[in-house]
UniProtKB/Swiss-Prot annotation:
It is found in: Plastid, Chloroplast. Its cofactor is Mg(2+). The lineage of its organism: Eukaryota, Viridiplantae, Streptophyta, Embryophyta, Tracheophyta. Keywords: Acetylation, Calvin cycle, Carbon dioxide fixation, Chloroplast, Disulfide bond, Lyase, Magnesium, Metal-binding, Methylation, Monooxygenase, Oxidoreductase, Photorespiration, Photosynthesis, Plastid. PROSITE patterns: RUBISCO_LARGE. Binds 1 Mg(2+) ion per subunit. Substrate binds at N123, T173, K177, R295, H327, S379. Mg(2+) binds at K201, D203, E204. It catalyses: 2 (2R)-3-phosphoglycerate + 2 H(+) = D-ribulose 1,5-bisphosphate + CO2 + H2O; D-ribulose 1,5-bisphosphate + O2 = 2-phosphoglycolate + (2R)-3-phosphoglycerate + 2 H(+). This is Ribulose bisphosphate carboxylase large chain. RuBisCO catalyzes two reactions: the carboxylation of D-ribulose 1,5-bisphosphate, the primary event in carbon dioxide fixation, as well as the oxidative fragmentation of the pentose substrate in the photorespiration process. Both reactions occur simultaneously and in competition at the same active site.
Amino acid sequence: MSPQTETKAGVGFKAGVKDYKLTYYTPDYETKDTDILAAFRVTPQPGVPPEEAGAAVAAESSTGTWTTVWTDGLTSLDRYKGRCYDIEPVAGEENQFIAYVAYPLDLFEEGSVTNMFTSIVGNVFGFKALRALRLEDLRIPPAYVKTFQGPPHGIQVERDKLNKYGRPLLGCTIKPKLGLSAKNYGRAVYECLRGGLDFTKDDENVNSQPFMRWRDRFLFCAEALYKAQAETGEIKGHYLNATAGTCEEMIKRAVFARELGVPIVMHDYLTGGFTANTSLAHYCRDNGLLLHIHRAMHAVIDRQKNHGIHFRVLAKALRMSGGDHIHSGTVVGKLEGERDITLGFVDLLRDDFVEKDRSRGIYFTQDWVSLPGVLPVASGGIHVWHMPALTEIFGDDSVLQFGGGTLGHPWGNAPGAVANRVALEACVQARNEGRDLAREGNEIIREASKWSPELAAACEVWKEIKFEFQAMDTL
């Protein structure tokens, strides 16, 4: 008896347990343009066939459960079930497979990343038949993309707001991340912005602690950026972290930032949650605020190669939920990030249409149908010697964020900012003149340091600093 006829009410209820693959493994299925497609890295328990493991993932993340239930006869499983439509072994890995699963669009609430993830990466990750499970990629169909607002403003609108074109934007995370008073914190912000940076940033765990309450920080930072704007003639911003213990408190902080007239606020989207993030993104669009996103907690989810969720999926989810910037790794700094894979999800953040490219970890062609793009933020262990590589790798539509690489300058914060701005302008000019940044990068920085004592001092301090560890996030 076929799985389809078993679920028809006219046949009668047949109790018991049957293999998932009888119903949920459908290798002849032709995917629809409206399906959400998922690529899972599956490691079955010994003795579990890969087809059964893939079917179990499809079942437990859609309509299935561990046994046959009589209420199956009250609906059409063929309409609503997830289907494992293909399985392929992972090259070079024993007992690992990529299982491709198609989900009907009707399974998901419109405009809700929360609901999408609750289904696709919910209970199935604790399933006993699987030794490990990792969601490698999702194809979000245009029909579903169109139910999301996405980033509050996007790349072009941000450039127009800031009146800054033709180069990456420069930022700095204020350090020490915890312990400064609000006034001293604001002083550090002012010095960095006056020196030539476009942005400064609250660190991800700066919320509203006893040593510095959020309202005091917002006031002193607003004073700092307005003073720096008046002195430099450039529009400046500070990422005021609105993350809070409740959505109501988060929105209250964003409202106060808007009343101060600052251009941008910030949110920790994984610890804060997708529902809170989408709510804040909607507020930011309605009220003209840019939204910077920090990915605190991402490595808990994405760093293990065989279990969890790859960051490219979290990046796609952020573009849907809403954010104008997101931290994306550096390739060259202290934090995890392999070049081809990093550039793969950077393209998924910025571009409107991205072709399937397995060499960069992109399992599906993704059409964003004009959903605004997100600026990738390179941050973590970078300094002036990295500037040529960062400019070449990330291009103009990016934010290069130097925390210790600004505040660690031997002459202070403002000279540290000057050094970074001079290095960036030198790299952009050299690139525009046709020079090869990858090959001539060090020479370009040395030439610029001859007429910038601030850059020369920075070059001397960080000439021996390297973070040489093998990346774990490989294909």
